[in-house]
Amino acid sequence: MQREKVAVIIGPTAVGKTKLSIDLAKALNGEIISGDSMQIYRTMDIGTAKVTKEEMDGIPHYMVDIKNPEESFSVAEFQERVRKHIREITERGKLPIIVGGTGLYIQSVLFDYQFTDDAGDAIYREQMEKLALERGVEYVHKKLQEVDPESAERIHANNVRRVIRALEIFHTSGEKMSDQLEKQENELLYDVSLIGLTMDREMLYDRINLRVDIMMDQGLLEEVEGLYNRGIRDCQSIQAIGYKEIYDYFEDRVSLEEAVSQLKTNSRRYAKRQLTWFRNKMDVTWFDVTDGEKTSEILRYIEGKLQLKSNNSK
């Protein structure tokens, strides 16, 4: 049975994935699936750098604005929804193009990841949640480092839910989450062209800093204030970079200037972690866009890899 063709564009935040994906979708008769775990949330537009209607330019986008901020969302649900979109887009004679920066989510779609339906150990989970509240997220993250350093490296301390899930897997099965994933990383389920964008680090960091300034000008403070005033607390959504820092400001833990500075720092660190993840976990063909766009070059590469003809070459 012939595998479905999928183009995937990955790279750190602010590197220019959105524009490239739309240009490629136009040329390759494609439709776009967001591979970002935070763009799924409604009303969280500015802080997630969500693609706008104007930017979409008529290209259908999926996995955007599908959940309310107070709702949780799992990798397993992402996997199920995206695979359904891939199937439906392919059936319409279009090319699915996955775009994003959340490595584990994208990887879970492309490879044969199995997610167990067992409830785990609710008592142990509650104990860990209590520890996180009483002794801090870093304490729980350190416990994960002791039993599963690879997962601890991959999962940020502030993502308490996933930290506790990894601990719970080890507690119930005696097996590391990282080992479980490693077993499932061998075979691609699709005929994939995996493209990565990179650029000079200083230039990327300058772009990230500028993006944060633009977000503030566009109304990020008001966007986060709206969530805060709705009473949204301790939710998966507000762990996102761009929200947790501004929440600290509304909780009077830092000044606005300090919050913005921390947002820039966290965004730069996240970009570095994204690049490390993709380079270590995926067989990516990288294109350096320091000196400008490489749209034509990338288009030719995808055409060759997936044996496609673009609208430009017809």
From Swiss-Prot:
**Superkingdom per UniProt:** Bacteria
Q: Which Gene3D superfamilies match?
A: 1.10.20.140, P-loop containing nucleotide triphosphate hydrolases
Which GO molecular function terms does the record list? ATP binding; tRNA dimethylallyltransferase activity
Question: Might you give the EC number(s) for this enzyme?
Answer: 2.5.1.75
Give the main EC class.
Answer: transferase
Which residues are ATP-binding? G11, P12, T13, A14, V15, G16, K17, T18
Cofactor field? Mg(2+)
Question: What InterPro entries does the entry give?
Answer: Dimethylallyltransferase (IPR039657), IPT (IPR018022), P-loop_NTPase (IPR027417)
Q: Where is this site: Interaction with substrate tRNA?
A: T102, R125
Q: Which Pfam families match?
A: IPPT
Name by which UniProt lists this protein: tRNA dimethylallyltransferase
Its ancestry begins with: Bacteria, Bacillati, Bacillota, Bacilli, Bacillales
Encoding gene (name): miaA
